[in-house]
C-alpha cells in the first residue's frame, strides 16, 4: 500500500482559483470556522445577463476539476459546453483539494484541524457554494447538477435556494440517506480507525493510516459497482502470479485513493452524507420535497446497490415538476462516471428543454 497523499499542488489543476471568506462561517450545527477558503474552477464566459450558469457538484472523493473526472461531458455540443455556458465547480467544505477541511490550519491551535474539524452537513456545503456565487456576482443558476454526494447538494440547493437554483439534475441519490448507506459508511470509517497509524486522527503527515483508508476504499468499491459488473469484468480469472483479478483490482483502487485523499477528510464527508435528509428540521420529509417546484430530472441507475431506483422513484413521485431517467447499465452506482456519452446527452437534452420553456 502507498504511504500517503501526494502534495496538493500535484492533485489539483493549476487553473484552480481561490476565494476566502471575509467573515467567520457558522455551521448548521453551531460550530464556527474563523475562516473558510474555497477552491473552484470555471469554464466559459458569464454572459451579460448572468443567466448562463451551470453549477456542478462533485462526489465524495472528487474535486473542483470536473473536466478531469467528468471530462466526457465537456465539449462543444456536449452537456457542458463552455462556448455556450459559464460552468462552475467548487471543492466542497470539508474536502482536501483546496477548500477548508481537516487538512487546513486551525487558527486556534496553529496546526491542522485533523479530527477537531467540526461535524458538517450537506447544507453547510451548499451555503459555502452560495457564498462563492455571491462573490462571483451570480444570483441565478440555470442548472445545478451532480451525482452521489453531489446529488445531495443538488437537492439541498433546490430546498435552500429555490430562487437561485432554477433547475436540478440529481443523479444516483435519494432524498435521505438510508440505514443501508449509513451502515456501509460506518464500516468504512471503522476500517480507517482500526489502522494502528490512525492515532485518534492525529496521524503523522508522512505516516497516515494508509492500510485503513485503502481498505475503506475497497469496501466502497464493492458498493460502487455491481455483482454483474464484477462477474463480467473479472469472473474467477487470475493474474500470472495466481492472484484473483478481482483481488488485484481492489488493491489497485485502494492504493490509488491513498495517494490522493486524506483519512480525516473521508470520515468528515461520509458523516456529512449520513446527515442527509431533506426533511430534517423542516416540516417533514414529504412536505419538504413536495415544496421544491423547480424542473427536476432525476437520473436513476438500474444496477445501483447503494441508492436503488426505488429511492429515485420515490423522489419523482413527490417532486411536483420532475421526470425520471434510467441508465440501464451493469456498472452499478459509478455508471454516471462510466457511461459519460449517455449522461452528457441527458444533461444536454435537459438544458435544451429548460431553454425552450424559457
UniProtKB/Swiss-Prot annotation:
**Enzyme Commission (EC) number:** 2.3.1.31
UniProt KW keywords: Acyltransferase, Amino-acid biosynthesis, Cytoplasm, Methionine biosynthesis, Transferase
The places in or outside the cell where this protein is found are: Cytoplasm
Q: What GO molecular-function term can you cite, just one?
A: homoserine O-acetyltransferase activity
Q: Name one GO cellular component term.
A: cytoplasm
Principal EC category: transferase
A Pfam family the protein falls into: Abhydrolase_1
Instruction: Identify the residues that the record assigns to the AB hydrolase-1 domain, covering every copy.
Output: 52-337
Residues reported to bind substrate = 217, 334
Query: What SUPFAM superfamilies does UniProt report for this protein, alphabetically?
Result: alpha/beta-Hydrolases (SSF53474)
Q: From the record, give the cysteines joined by S-S bonds.
A: none
* Active-site residues annotated for this sequence: 148 (nucleophile), 304, 333
Highest taxon listed in the record's lineage: Bacteria
Which reaction(s) does the protein catalyse, per the Swiss-Prot or TrEMBL entry?
L-homoserine + acetyl-CoA = O-acetyl-L-homoserine + CoA
Recorded metabolic or biological pathway in which this protein acts: Amino-acid biosynthesis; L-methionine biosynthesis via de novo pathway; O-acetyl-L-homoserine from L-homoserine: step 1/1
Assign the protein's first listed, main location to one coarse class. Answer: cytoplasm
Q: Name one GO biological process term.
A: homoserine metabolic process
Q: What job does this protein perform?
A: Transfers an acetyl group from acetyl-CoA to L-homoserine, forming acetyl-L-homoserine.
Record-stated family: Belongs to the AB hydrolase superfamily. MetX family.
Q: Which NCBIfam families match?
A: homoserO_Ac_trn (TIGR01392), PRK00175.1 (NF001209)
Assembly and interactions?
Answer: Homodimer.
Q: What's the protein here called?
A: Homoserine O-acetyltransferase
**Organism of this sequence:** Chlorobium luteolum (strain DSM 273 / BCRC 81028 / 2530)
